[in-house]
């Protein structure tokens, strides 16, 4: 059976990561969470004092960008990959609100995106991957055999994010998360470097009122169509 690249783009907290993880597990592909990579760089910046309020010290980050090693290792308990920053498991830290509030300024930096896109393209050379993010189908893998664009209303996405954080033992305010979701939508859609946009040949899924099982069935149907089975 031929292996392909599956690119899943969409808004923050649209459920695309859960969908991508479940699909990868179901079909035996490798899952790569590009959002986690940008969050890991953001955590590195926080740890090294590269923020002055909302502003990032660009020159200091640029000088350190090649010292940042991001990898994914399978968590035997969850059956899903955890994110490692320079050899340390940071899966819980990168999901907190402090990182969520600061990730957009980091992700808008051209040199950060170029460094991570190069790493993502290297990861996908052998195919057999499911990669989710904001610019996978438009920038990272414009020739991906299957492109999907996932969306949902800001209110639905904020509720999902709160539920996800609380399930991990991270306290969260719905109003604060909703404000963060809307702010990230604006920044992601208007930034100069690789803005969030739907690829012309992407299949669109609005999952505002779909169950996880309905989403999974739809995804598998698109996958089998793409590989011709």
From Swiss-Prot:
Keywords: ATP-binding, Cytoplasm, Kinase, Nucleotide-binding, Transferase. Belongs to the cytidylate kinase family. Type 1 subfamily. It catalyses: CMP + ATP = CDP + ADP; dCMP + ATP = dCDP + ADP. Signal peptide: none annotated. Its main location: cytoplasm. The gene is cmk. The lineage of its organism: Bacteria, Pseudomonadati, Bacteroidota, Bacteroidia, Bacteroidales. PANTHER family: CYTIDYLATE KINASE, CYTIDYLATE KINASE/PANTOATE-BETA-ALANINE LIGASE. GO terms for molecular function: ATP binding; CMP kinase activity; dCMP kinase activity. This is Cytidylate kinase. One of its GO terms (cellular component) is cytosol. The keyword Kinase applies. GO terms for biological process: nucleobase-containing small molecule interconversion; pyrimidine nucleotide metabolic process. Its EC number is 2.7.4.25. It is found in: Cytoplasm. ATP binds at residues 10-18.
């Amino acid at each position: 059976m031929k292996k392909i690249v599956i690119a899943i783009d969409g808004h923050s907290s649209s459920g695309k990561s859960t969908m991508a993880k479940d699909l990868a597990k179901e079909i035996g592909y490798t899952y790569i969470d590009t959002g986690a990579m940008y969050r890991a760089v953001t955590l590195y910046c926080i740890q090294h004092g590269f923020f002055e309020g909302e502003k990032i010290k660009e020159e200091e980050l640029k000088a350190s960008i090649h010292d940042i090693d991001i990898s994914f290792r399978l968590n035997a308990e969850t059956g899903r990959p955890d994110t490692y920053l320079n050899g340390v498991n940071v899966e819980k830290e990168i999901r907190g609100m402090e990182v969520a509030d600061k990730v957009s300024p980091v992700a808008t930096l051209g040199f950060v995106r170029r460094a991570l896109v190069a790493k993502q393209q290297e990861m996908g050379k052998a195919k057999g991957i499911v990669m989710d993010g904001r610019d996978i189908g438009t920038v990272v893998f414009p020739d991906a055999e299957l492109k999907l664009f996932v969306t949902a209303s800001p209110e639905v996405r904020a509720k999902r994010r709160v539920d996800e954080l609380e399930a991990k033992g991270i306290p969260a305010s719905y109003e604060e998360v909703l404000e963060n979701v809307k702010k990230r939508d604006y920044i992601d859609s208007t930034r100069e470097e690789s803005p969030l946009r739907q690829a012309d040949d992407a299949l669109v899924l609005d999952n505002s009122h779909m169950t996880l099982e309905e989403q999974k069935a739809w995804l598998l149907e698109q996958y089998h169509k793409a590989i011709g089975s």
